[in-house]
Amino acid sequence: MKKIVFALLLAVMGAGNAWAQMEKPYNEEIDPLAQIEQAVKEAQQTGKYVVCQVGGNWCPWCLKFNKFIHEDAEIAKLVSDNYVYIHVNWPRRGGSVELQKRLNNFARFGFPVMVVLNSEGTPIHLQDSSFLEEGSGYNKEKTQRFFTNWTKAAVESLK
């Protein structure tokens, strides 16, 4: 029995240590509204859309998604070629009403949530990340489909 308890303790400690070592992409010190406006300016200059990955360093699924999209070469290229991608910090205990209004009440979906903004900064899609999940991670095909379907070229193809 002691061996089982010890093995479980080691497994829990290992999982916690792995989570603690993941990159922390959310900057808790910057103004998220100013961050979004800067990203929109960059999108206008580069002909891209903006993806705001809203969440926090406190959120294991947010960190998993960040790791997933950067470690998969195809997804990383799809994102970098088509989007200005930012991590918008949302405090664990809730953030500003202004940010919620700016990004169409995103918190109703849980975290992370991806908000796609067009080149003018208007939210055009909110992606509930639970639809991209598979098991204890994310599904590559669903994630690629999301990013492909919301590129500027795809959305504006009939204009």
Feature map (PLM): residue ranges:
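Thiol-based oxidoreductase modules, predominantly thioredoxin-like and allied folds used
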Residues: I30-P32, D72-V97
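Non-catalytic, surface beta->alpha helical segment in thiol-disulfide oxidoreductase systems
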Residues: F109-L158
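Hydrophobic beta-strand anchors of alpha/beta hydrolase catalytic cores
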Residues: V50-C52, Y85, M114
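N-terminal leader/targeting and pre-domain segments
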Residues: Q21-T46, V155
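Positively charged n-region of N-terminal signal peptides that target proteins for export
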Residues: M1-I4
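Bacterial N-terminal signal peptides
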Residues: A7-G16
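Local sequence-structure signature of Cys/Sec-based thiol-disulfide redox active-site neighborhoods
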Residues: Q38-E71, I75
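Structural alpha/beta surface segment adjacent to cysteine/selenocysteine redox centers
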Residues: P91-G110, E120
